[in-house]
Amino acid sequence: MATNRLVKNLTGIILLILAVAFVVKFAGPNILRQYISSGIGNCKITPILCMQPEEKSFTPLINAEYKESLIPYNFPKMSVSVPKGFTLIQELIKKPYYKKRHANNKAVIYLLIQEPGAFMKLYPEVQKQGINDNYAFINRLMHARLNQVNNITDAFFVVMKSVFTPDVGNQSTSKMIKFELADLKGFINYSMAKPDNYFDCNVSDQAGNFYKLYIKDIGARLDLNNVFAIISTLKPVN
């Protein structure tokens, strides 16, 4: 059911990708980039479309005392522990989630889980590019750059990057990092420009599950180490 709703919500994006395929066939890379920019914005308007994670993988140390202070919550298919004062919402991937629709002044954490191989089921064609699990899909997506689009695969992942990336505040000051944490690994796009912090966390576990945590930290109470402590509590629930 979740996968069916996900497909429905991304219909517009798929149509854009089909149009991109037409442009690829009859035009060169420069025209292709211009066409994509007309649909999702350019690097000046949306800098993260031309950003990629820092090369070095970050290995955080978790503050055990802080982790112990977190409050545990159970949701369908996943559990997580978070600080007091945050509203939690479990979501599906859909366009409204990733825009500035949630422009209220409440500290909130949006949660998402996708089962192993979910992205392969949605987009089986990517397996021809050697992408065979959720982590490989997200890795390719995070490294996608509009100014390096040369073919339909490049275009697909840039478009998907625009969909998967929520509001992270001032993108001109945002950063992208990759990390490894015990049996978890992934990427964080974040901005820590006061008065508010934003953290877009894309996490995979050893079983192949994909988790997304979007943290809107009103009042800038969290730092990166706090966010890693929250990530470390992610678990699937059968």
Predicted features and spans:
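N-terminal targeting sequences that direct proteins away from the cytosol to non-cytosolic compartments
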Residues: 2-118, 195, 214-238
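Conserved polar/disulfide-associated segments of primarily extracytoplasmic proteins
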Residues: 43, 93-211
